[in-house]
Amino acid sequence: VKTKLRICSMALVFALAAVLPAGATDLVIAMPNWPSGQAAANILKVGIAKKFGLEAEIQPLGTLNAFVGLDGGKVDIQPEVWRPNFDELIKKYVTEKSTVTLSPRGVAAWQGLCATPEAAKTIKSVSDLADAAKTKILDTDDDGLGEMWIGAPTWLSTGIERVRANSYGYGANLTLVEVEEDVAMAAVDAAVATGRPMVFYCYAPHHVFELHKLVRLEEPPHDDAKWKIVPARDPLWISKSSATTAWDATEFRIAYATAFGKKHPDIARFLDHVDFSQEEVTKMSYALEVERQLPIDYATKWVEANATRIDGWAKQ
């Protein structure tokens, strides 16, 4: 009888295991593959657990997939949505479908091209990049073409930088490199340390400006009439697009699923009041990329050090 009872008990355990989710969580936070976004995702995770008692799962996702998840109920929060990069997604999911909500608070940012001090002696503007005699200083593999990092392979901004290179004309005499950001930043460190010229895509807030004296390349101010970016859902969007001016004014905000906000209005208010500063975002980037802190460890310490502020976000 005891044997039969044990067998029945084990069968019940296995049956329950089959229907109950392992490590079930209350919400899903998308995590971008850049350091400040990784830190912010984990700060929201720890902060929400502390103030509302809900456990969040962190899922590494690009912004496009995050928006699809927000729209379909598979993702609840995206910590950094960059504009104007993702204005097409915002138009579709925020303005037209109303399935995604943007926080009213944004962090001012910018993006463009930067040069190391040695490169800036020769290359001062994007027009200089179209001069092969000047860009030969960027040639590191002796193939006759200079190299320039334009971003990580999965970033939308990387495709836009390729459009800009083609439109300005410097794409013809430069090898446009796409690699993950940590690899590129290591290359910047090495270039500055050895006095080797380097030009690369840059954005701020970012820790690289705490480490090095970089020069932002000059270019014509943004002009909507000269900035025609075809939606990335078109397979030929890069070849169909053109952009011969600087990026428009940039910012990033938190996004969350509208349905999630209705289900958890207290957390929606919390998200609406998150007010990271540019300096804080730079410190996040520095902590993860330079000090090599794990995102969850950094976030736990950040929430502890900013307990009063977290309380304020939750009470407003």
Regions found by a protein language model. Give the residues of each.
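Short, well-ordered beta-strand elements
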Residues: 25-36, 54-59, 145-149, 271
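Short helix-initiation/N-cap motifs at beta->coil->alpha
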Residues: 34-35, 55-69, 176-187
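Short, polar/charged alpha-helical segment
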Residues: 36-53, 165
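N-terminal segment of the mature folded domain
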Residues: 63-116
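Ligand-binding pocket segment of bilobal, Venus flytrap-like solute-binding proteins
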Residues: 75-82, 149-228
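A conserved helix-loop-strand patch within extracytoplasmic ligand-binding domains
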Residues: 98-150
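A bilobed periplasmic-binding-protein/Venus flytrap-type ligand-binding module shared by bacterial periplasmic
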Residues: 110-120, 251-263, 284
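C-terminal lobe and pocket-closing loops
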Residues: 209-270, 274
